[in-house]
Amino acid sequence: MHALLLGIVLAQATPGVLALSPSNLTLNPAQQQNVAVSGATPPLQATLDRKLVTVAVAQDGRSVIVTATQATGSDVLHLVDGAGAQADLPIRVAFNAGTIVPQTTLTVTGNPADPAWLAARVTGWVTQLTKALPGAKVTIAPVTPPSSPLPPGTSAQFVVPVQIDGNGEYFDQSGTTSVNVQNLALEPFSPGLLFYDDDPEHLMQDGVLFRGTVTAAQPARLYYYHDDGLDPRKLVVALTSSSQDPTSVQLVDASAGPNMDVMHVGQTLTKNFLLTKARAEGVVVNLSQDEPYLLADVPMAARQLVSGTVDVRVLSGGPVVATVLSVSNGADPRTLLDGPILPGDGHHRTGAFKIDGFGTNALAYTAGGPDATLVVGDTDPTPPSVNPAAPGHDYGDYGVVHTIALSLNNPGAAPFTAYLYFKPLAGPARASFLIDGNLDDVGCVRVPTPYQVTSFNLAAGSTYRTVIQTMTDGASFYPAVIGITATPPQPGAPAISAPDGCFPKPQESPPPR
């Protein structure tokens, strides 16, 4: 009996535990949330460890309203009621790691649009739309390419999982972005203007590297080629328009890098752009007056190269200004847009050039006749400058697509094999050729001798015609000869360090006798 009475007395004397819902809080700065309190006997008292929030307690003790201040961190709210019952509420105040856009529309062009290209564009589009705070890490799940190309006038849907890791500083965010891809039917276009940007080649400070204006009447191509100096920085390509009219642009682009292997970057860019341009694969974006569109925003480490080619067509509104920027880590590209152009390095590999019709060539070869040859990338002819008084030049035809109408004729009574070859004249060079929709490339070659690109087997009495497209690879030395011959050329590029390779290894001297 005494034990029972003692238990009752102890139960009455021991304070109870309050029930809270939710049992912990995660708040953004200035965010407010109501917390329900069960089992409290008024009055309810509240104290805080750090005062990262403010607390308003209801008179009946059934709830508290917690409001975060602008400070971030962790706090604990201690509640005690009139009977001594207690509860602790852990609180964390932080910003969300970023913002995931739930749905969007991506307008593309392509005749048709290749599945792998589409998947890459969707990934890039979602990456660009996903905004993360400094120090947070964005992870875009791999996008599965569609089972078939996307024809003009059709659409496709993609659901892309996105994760933003707050790295302990922010609240992690996870979700999906639904992308409706629409393939807009547009006629292909060829720019008549080339913006050539390779001066200064090495990035040593922040600022504007190149600035050019594109109008609806004259599409333009931007070719940029830069490597980083000593400090990590970004290469940014921004498109802006001050027009009050809605401005829409079509962008057909490819890029390569960052990579320290400059010749690999140059050839990768050529191959990617030739294929992309042939399929008319691009994106259509709308520009706003108050926000630049970042076509490229590429982090670079010391000595890494980034290069790109983009054809720009203004579909409505405009004009559009294309600006290439060197931006140190942490700097806002928008603060540099209106600055002066950085001093050049003295090579004058920059400027605006007329390329309408430039690079249109023909090769005609008849079996049994002399070789047919064409020199590309020489100092004469070279794309003429828009401003004849400007010091810039484009020796090497960088950024120019050479389109070669090839005609082969075999009038004889026996089959015949003709060889397409590439012959460097100025030093190490690589080359890529788009022939009948397929890419053929030549590895790094240096010695001025013909190297085989491909061969053509001609039946007796037959004629063959096709169109070949090629571009000067960045980091390659031009001019070079493109030719057709009956004599089998060297079948492939030698090893890089071979005596006839691009960068021969010094030969050891023979031991003295």
Residues of each region from the PLM?
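Proline-enriched interdomain boundary motifs that mark the N-terminal boundary
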Residues: 15-21, 99-102
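Short, solvent-exposed loop/linker segments at the N-terminal edge
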Residues: 25-30, 107-118, 396
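A short beta-strand micro-motif common to beta-rich folds, especially ectodomain repeats
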Residues: 37, 72-84, 156-166, 310
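Short glycine/proline-centered coil/turn motifs in the loop regions
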Residues: 39-42, 49-51
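Extracellular/luminal low-complexity segments enriched in Ser/Thr/Pro
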Residues: 62-74, 143-152
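Short, exposed coil/turn segments at beta-strand boundaries within extracellular/luminal domains
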Residues: 81-88, 167-175
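Short beta-strand edge segments in extracellular beta-sheet folds
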Residues: 90-97, 176-184
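Long compositionally biased, domain-poor regions of proteins
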Residues: 111-112, 128, 132, 145-151, ...
